[in-house]
Amino acid sequence: MTVFRSSETASSSDSLREALRLAASALKAHGPPFALAGSYALWVHGGPEPVHDVDFAVAESDVDAATATLETAGFTITRPPEDWLFKAGLDSVFVDVLHAINDVPVDAELIRSGESHEVLAIRMHVLSPTLVLTQKLCALHEHSCDFAKLLPAVRAVRERVDWEQVRANTATNDFAVAFFALTDRLGITSAPK
């Protein structure tokens, strides 16, 4: 089956992949330890390919080392007002380097929790779909609650997720609970008995 994509999307995907490859290669060679996170982690596990940015996680204590490594590799470093990440720019694309997720500092244990996968010919830790979806659902709130963006990824990785764990870890977020009501009705997930 032939899939047609606009040249803009193909170009964006190529640029994101190149940024992912270059950042991972630099971090793997010069440290600090890292893990692929966010939508690209879901992509490794079978989700749709992201079109906006690449997410890596580094321990909060390793931010300066990660900044130095990526800057030396040719990335332009910017620090947005959010105090839980920095951005490493390469041409027109960004690698978001997260050192806290949902107000929880990233630590070495989280990085090590990722399974080792070969991603674009580079072996790296990749966060599990259970963890990534937990993080994405915990981040939902009244100003950021686009279920349509989550549904394709959830549908694609549903057999690789410990849904009981995700439900337990997101039970205090009303938007996550509402998301599960939708996915249960759509047959993507099953309500606990």
Tell me what each language-model feature is:
Residues M1-K193:
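Compositionally biased terminal segments of proteins
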